[in-house]
Amino acid sequence: MSNLIPPHGGKGLTICLLEGAELEEEKKKAQGLKQIPITPSERGDLIMIGTGGFSPLSGFMTKADWKSVCDNYLLADGTFWPIPVTLSASKEDADSISEGDEVALYDPEGDEIMATMKVTEKYEMTEENKRYQCEKTFMGEGTTNAEEFWKIAEDEHPGVQKVMNQKQFNLAGPVKVLSESDFPTAYKGIYLRPSESRKIFEDKGWSRIPAMQLRNPMHRSHEYLAKIAIEVSDGVFIHSLVGNLKPGDIPADVRVKCIDVLVKNYFVEDKVVQGGYPLDMRYAGPREALLHATFRQNYGCSHMIIGRDHAGVGDFYGMFEAQTIFDKIPYPEETGKALLCKPLKIDWTFYCHKCDGMASLKTCPHAKEDRVILSGTMLRKSLSEGTPIPDHFGRKEVLDILREYYEGLTDKVEVKLHGAATGDEKK
């Protein structure tokens, strides 16, 4: 009997990734099917469906699921789910498909068929529907109304841009996943399926496991958060996004090197498990924090570390909106349908000169002038511009790796600071 938190949905991990003879047979069949091209973001979602990371999803959402998730944070059957997971297709492709047809999902970037799909429904994503999804998914406390949101969203919000650039139709239906792309080889030893992370945790005898979401290299604030989590748990799961980020962010292979050297030199190694997952960032702030908790439950994590501006971008969200949303979502009475992974909420963290170390608003009594807010955005800006980085911003071993990466860039990366990066607490 496992001591781990059960997968989301109450039915165990929903695995749609084929193996062995079944895989080879489906690959042959896929060669004769109509091919639907998918985006890198859809590829990441597809792999998560395949491995059980998105349990209980077994395919891409119907219109009823899409609408219910947008409106109520619930699938049509009443299971909690925070963000639409959909597959787009051009009008030309959609017109050539009938409901009940099987299609092959083709990844142009990797030049391979990733999955087969039985199309149970196709529905139009009008401009109105796309805007509706964006307002429900991406609009936070940083803007007061839809009019204000749309004044800046299409220019400044990468998640909004992705949705608005999607093709005209969505295809829904169950999938049979044939490949995990190059993630298992490109991130060997880091990329983990939920079944693999669960086995690691079980072998260690862990049950209270907070997950730490990373899309930036670990600076001192990240280190502090992880160590706080370790103090109140069996160990921490440092789970890095190895899919695509927005332009100017630091690539996954560099971030993984930084985590490796930090864990080796500054952590008790058997209290840390490092993993990677294949999604692209959505930058959906509070809703994405809920998604992070949902799929971390599938990976075996009991808690999700939520700090300031989790999964945010620019000034679209309140600093701690990603924490308070956990108190506002529906919790279905049927336990398996409710989100069980709980937030580990952590206050503002910073380096304090008077404390001579990392601290938070709960532990440091000193003035704002004594504090240095540490953020990935500020770190990237300093590295890009070649300006000095104070020792308290990051460990030397980590900064050396980052400097080497930035020195090798041929084009200068412009990094824009925003409220969450500078410590502006007005939100």
PLM features: residue spans?
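Active-site cores that bind ATP or allylic diphosphates and position pyrophosphate for catalysis
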Residues: 1-427
